[in-house]
Swiss-Prot record:
Pfam family name, one: SAM_GIDA_C
Organism: Methylobacterium sp. (strain 4-46)
PANTHER family (alphabetical): GLUCOSE INHIBITED DIVISION PROTEIN A, PROTEIN MTO1 HOMOLOG, MITOCHONDRIAL
GO biological process: tRNA methylation; tRNA wobble uridine modification
The protein's name: tRNA uridine 5-carboxymethylaminomethyl modification enzyme MnmG
Taxon lineage: Bacteria, Pseudomonadati, Pseudomonadota, Alphaproteobacteria, Hyphomicrobiales
Record carries keyword NAD: yes
Length: 627
């Protein structure tokens, strides 16, 4: 990555957060001359809130970004200082890899990855305006007046669009602490008629770990065998650390209740919605009044950084109240507050303004990714960013744009949810959002998406080679399992109790039994001991879910049939007899691309779908004549 080496680009990405870096790197991997515009080079890849990657649902997104040769997984593996596999006791489909990260190491590793990316230039500056001619973006204008022409723009503005920080009664315009908001771009989007709304998020105070009484605090260790995010990572080499666990007390809750009138969420200073699944401590105290305490994870921000992130007490109370609250938390009675917590409000664009490609419908060549689309979280941003970057590069090259659907990825689930339903609060990924989650597991992200990425041009040679080798190893091991078989009598001699029905069962079928693991199989067939652990674990999961996956494949086939029925972009819903006015308004707002997407709009009835299918068939029949 160079500072700037040209005056015209194929793709310009605005914003260097988690969506922006993935968008820029993806576009560059496709061969597009790409510029990444950010206020300061030093903030590229910054973790603005919690120093962690992954988690339930989110870990799936990281694996999918990695499968498309994105950066987040590899960078998180380099910077991770506490790896834990969440939901380990539950089924493989809902387990979530998570890593506490060294904040400085993560940013440095991300910047190094970008620097090693060909076709990518860095421009330090503020994007102030879009150049739009006849409904198509032709470039951007920087705050210093420089015009940068291009074929496609990706906006990844995070919380910067008219960002406003709240700490008690005090407010300050900012995109995050110490950085100015993006006012010009917000005005530009207004001018072009985009539907803008306001959302809010928050962050807790930062503490000095040297002033915390760790002796009386419960410790949470990293996993003994860290599970990496990237399929290209053989093992984790970064030292692993412990986190602390403490709780709020009744005295904390009483103090917060006594000062609710000073919190902007309760004084009327903030009226926008925040993330439901990451509430402030004020919201926790109000919504869960019967609880005598709320868990707080004391998470170190780095191996050589004393800063502690107290996960669980995001707040916008006045600074002096925050200090008083700390005095009442076990272990934090003498903790020094390095920076107060705050809430931040920002503009977002109604994601129903987007196509599933993440291109806006109002301005051709303009793509949006990340919090500007109403999502929350680094991983959600990265998932959108990589698809937006791919499609921006493909548009610049004159190629067809790509869509990831619900049946192949959590990225597809997220984008379909956004463009179909919009948001009323910041959108967070959970495995429960997918109806195909047995098929969309963290262990098969490569199989689902890397081949697709190779076809799209976003996967480099090293990953393509690794993918081919791993698929060959998987296929060979599966073929061996299918070829090996045993009768119930033979199994009994090995200590396995099977139904005495005389039926020979393959090793793959045996692997579906909960009590039969890979070592038990290897005791019967010693050659299986040579199968790599990753391959063995993957095959055991496939075997355990085999019956259910067969059913799900049938469901996915039905889904794909509905997705194959395209609805004309010019379809006038107001002229379709039999649709209620309410449905006409909803359909006109979303403008579904397929019959399947229309079916997912709230209130759309089977009768309405029949009418839409009839219009789609008529449009298909008329297409050859029009051509």
């Amino acid at each position: 990555m160079q500072r700037i080496d040209r005056t015209r680009f194929d793709v310009i990405v605005v914003g260097g957060g988690h969506a922006g870096v993935e968008a820029a790197a993806a576009a560059a991997r496709l061969g597009a001359a790409t510029a990444l515009v950010t206020h300061r080079r030093a903030t590229l890849g910054a973790m603005s809130c919690n120093p962690a990657i992954g988690g339930l649902g989110k870990g799936h997104l990281v694996r999918e970004v990695d499968a498309l040769d994105g950066l987040m997984g590899r960078v998180a593996d380099r910077a991770g200082i506490q790896f834990r596999l969440l939901n380990r006791r539950k089924g493989p489909a809902v387990r979530g890899p998570r890593s506490q990260a060294d904040r400085k190491l993560y940013a440095r590793a991300m910047q190094e990855a970008l620097a090693a990316t060909p076709n990518l230039s860095l421009i330090e500056g503020e994007a102030h305006d879009l150049a739009v001619v006849e409904g198509r973006v032709t470039g951007i204008v920087l705050a210093d007046g420089r015009a940068l022409p291009c074929a496609a723009v990706v906006l990844t503005t995070g919380t910067f669009l008219r960002g406003l920080i709240h700490i008690g009664e005090r407010t300050m315009p900012a995109g995050r602490v110490g950085e100015a908001p993006a006012l010009g771009l917000a005005a530009t989007l207004d001018r072009h008629g985009f539907g803008l709304g306001r959302l809010k998020t928050g962050t807790p105070a930062r503490l000095d770990g040297r002033t915390i009484d760790w002796a009386g605090i419960e410790k949470q260790a990293a996993d003994d065998e860290p599970v990496p995010f990237s399929s290209l990572t053989d093992r984790i080499t970064t030292p692993q650390i412990e986190c602390g666990v403490t709780r709020t007390t009744q005295a904390v809750h009483d103090l917060i209740r006594a000062n609710l009138h000073r919190s902007p969420m309760y004084s009327g200073g903030i009226t926008s919605r925040g993330p439901r699944y990451c509430p402030s401590i004020e919201d926790k105290v109000v919504r869960f009044g019967d609880r005598d305490g709320h868990q707080i994870f004391l998470e170190p921000e780095g191996l050589d950084d004393p800063t502690i992130y107290p996960n669980g007490i995001s707040t916008a109370l006045p600074e002096e109240v925050q200090r008083a609250v700390l005095r009442l938390i076990p272990g934090c009675e003498r903790a020094a507050m390095l920076r107060p917590g705050y809430a931040i409000e920002y503009d977002y664009v109604d994601p129903r303004e987007l196509d599933p490609t993440l291109q806006t419908r109002r301005v051709a060549g303009l793509f949006l990714a990340g919090q500007i689309n109403g999502t929350t979280g680094y991983e959600e941003a990265a998932g959108q960013g990589i698809l937006a970057g791919i499609n921006a590069a493909r548009l610049a090259a004159g190629s067809a744009l790509a869509v990831l659907d619900r049946a192949e990825s959590y990225i597809g689930v997220m984008i379909d949810d956004l463009v179909t339903h919009g948001v009323s609060e910041p959108y967070r990924m959970f495995t429960s959002r997918s109806e195909y989650r047995l098929s969309l597991r963290v262990d098969n992200a490569d199989e689902r998406l890397t081949g697709r990425g190779i076809a799209l041009g976003c996967v480099g040679a090293a990953r393509a080679r690794h993918f081919a080798e791993s698929q060959q190893a998987l296929a060979a091991a599966r073929a061996r399992l299918d070829a090996l078989a045993i009768t119930p009598s033979e199994a009994a001699r090995h200590g396995l109790a099977l139904n005495r029905d005389g039926i020979r069962r393959s090793a793959f079928q045996l692997l579906s039994y909960p009590e039969i693991d890979w070592p038990r199989l290897a005791a019967i067939w010693p050659e299986l001991a040579a199968v790599p652990p990753r391959v063995a674990e993957r095959l055991r999961t496939d075997a355990a879910y085999a019956v259910y996956l067969d059913r799900q494949r049938s469901d996915i086939a039905a889904f794909r049939r509905d997705e194959a029925v395209r609805l004309p972009a010019s379809l006038d819903y107001g002229r379709i007899a039999g649709l209620s006015n309410e449905l006409r308004l909803k359909l006109d707002c979303v403008r579904p691309h397929t019959l399947g997407q229309a079916a997912r709009i709230e209130g759309v009835t089977p009768a309405a779908l029949t009418l839409l299918a009839a219009h789609a068939r008529r449009a298909d029949a008329a297409a050859p004549a029009e051509a």
